[in-house]
Amino acid sequence: MIFQASFYKSKKLLLIEDCEPVRASIKGMLQQIGFDDITAVADAMQAVSPAKRHSFDFILADFNLGDGKDALQLFNELSALGAIKTACCFVLMSTEPQRLPVFGVLQGTPDHFVLKPFSYVELEKRLAKAWQNRTALRKVYQAIKQTDLASALLELDEAIKAGSANALQALRLKGELLLAQGEYNAAAQLYSKIQQQRDFSWARLGAAVTMVKLQQWADAEQALLQLAEQDDIRPEAVEWLARCYLLQADLVKAQEQLTELLKLQPTHIAAHYALADVLQLNGQQEDSSRYLQKLIQQFRFSAFDAPECYLQLSRVLLEQAQHAELGAFTAALKKSSEALASMPQKLTTDVIEPELAVLRARISLLQGNVADAKQQLNLITVATKPVHVAAEQDKARLAFALGDTKQAEAHLAVLKSADFAADDLSGCCQRLLAKQAVLRETELRAQLRDLNQAGMDAVQKGNVKVALVKLRQAFLLMPCNAGLALNLLQVLSQLPAHKALLPLAKAVLSALENTSVTSANQQRLAQLLPQLPELYLD
C-alpha cells in the first residue's frame, strides 16, 4: 500500500454503488484498506443529503447509478451545491472504460477513475494517487475556491516551473484560469505552445474555445468541427459548437448541434432545456410544446425531473390559448393550468413558488378572476436582476394585462439592462430570450393598437363578427384596459345572445368592475349595459 492504514483511518468516505452485493464487497475492501468512517448509499439522490451534511475526504462513485443521475452528473450537482470540499477526492469506478471530461477542470472534474473489477490493492493505489495529486495543488484549488485567481496563477506557475508530476494538470488549470480572467491572447499563446510540444486533445479544445471567446467565429467553427470528429472529445466539441452558434444567434445551426449532442448524451439536461429554448426562439411553439411534454414524460419522478419544464410548458400553452379561437379557448387555457398542476409537490420550492403564483395569476385573469390577479400583482417586486427571463416576462405580461404599464415597463427595464455574461448553454439562451422578450413586448403594444383600430373600423362598417374577433384578441392581451373592454362590450351588445359568448361577456364585465374608469367611460358603460342580452347579466 502507498499509505498506511492509519492514514485512511482518520478519513471520511462516501461510497455510492447501486448494486447491494457489490456495495458490500467494496465496503469490505475499504475497511481492509483502513477506512472506518464509511457512508454507503445506493444512488445519486441518496448521496446528496450526506454530502451536504458531512465533509468527506473521499467520494467513491460507480459511474452508472441505475435510473437516476450518473456519477458525472452527481459530481456536477454536488459541486454546484458546494458539497465537495476543496481537499475532497472524487473517484469514479465502472466495469467499462469511461471518458472523463477533457475541458472544465477549473469548474472541477473527478480526480481519478478505477476499472472494475479491482482488488483492494489497486483501489488503494487509485485513492492514494488521487490524494497525492489533489494535495500537490491544494493551494491552487483553495485560491480558486476563494476566487483569488491571481494567487492561483502564481501557484500554478511554481508547479509548472518545478516540473513536478502535476505539471500537466497545472497547465490545464492555467489555460482555463486565463480564459476565466479574460486573458484570451495569453491563453491562445499558452495552448499554442503546448501543442507545439504535444498534441493534447484538451489543448486543441482550449485553443478552439479561446477563438470563441475572441469572437473569431470562422476559425472557431473550423477547429470545433474538426474536433467533433474525434471520439475522445466529441461531446465537448459539439457543445462548444452549439455555444458558438448561439453566440452568433445562428439558431438553425445551434439546433442541429444540440440535437447531435443529445444523441451523444441523452441525459444532458442543459442541452434539453437549450433545445426547447431554441425551438421557442425560432417561433416553433407547437414543436416546443411537444418537446417539453416529451421531457416531462421521460424524466417525471426521476432524478432529472425539474420545475422548469412544467413552468415553460404552461407558458407555451398559455400563449397558444391567447391566440386560440373562441370555441377552443377554454380547453386551451385549461391545458396551461393542468401543466402547472401536474408538477410534483417536491419541486415546489421557495424559489419556484413565486414563479408559479405569477403564472397562476395570468391564467386566472384570462378566466375572468381579475381581483385575484390584482392581489397577486401587489405582491410582486421588481428584481434588481432577473432570476430567469421567462419569469420576469411573466411579471411584465401580468402587469400590462392588468393595466399597470408603469410596473410592466419596470420589469422590461430589468431585462433590457440584464447582463447575461455566462457563455454556457443556459447563459447563451437567456441572452437571446431577453432580447426577444423586449422586442415582443414592444410589438405587443403596437399589435394591441392595431387590433383595437381594426375592430372599431369593422364596427363602423357593420361587420360585427370581424370586430368580435379583433377586439377579443386585444382584450386577451390587456383585459383591464377600460377603453378596450368597452369596445368589446359594444360589439357583444350588437350580437345575439349565445352561450358560447357568456364566459367572454362575464370576463369583460368583471374586468370593468375591477378597473378604474373615467367619468366618460362610466357614462358609456351605463349606456351599454341596458343593450346587453339578459343572459350576460344574470
Describe the residue ranges of each PLM region.
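Conserved acidic segment of CheY-like receiver
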Residues: 9-21, 26-30
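Short hydrophobic/Thr-rich beta-strand motif most characteristic of the beta2 strand and flanking loop
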Residues: 35-43, 50
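Conserved phosphotransfer microenvironments
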Residues: 60-80, 86, 494, 501
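Alpha4 helix (beta4-alpha4-beta5 surface) of REC/receiver domains from two-component response regulators
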Residues: 72-73, 86, 96-112
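C-terminal output helix
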Residues: 118-127
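CheY-like receiver
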Residues: 131-183
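Flexible loop/N-cap segments at domain edges
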Residues: 185-410, 424-432, 443-463, 491-495
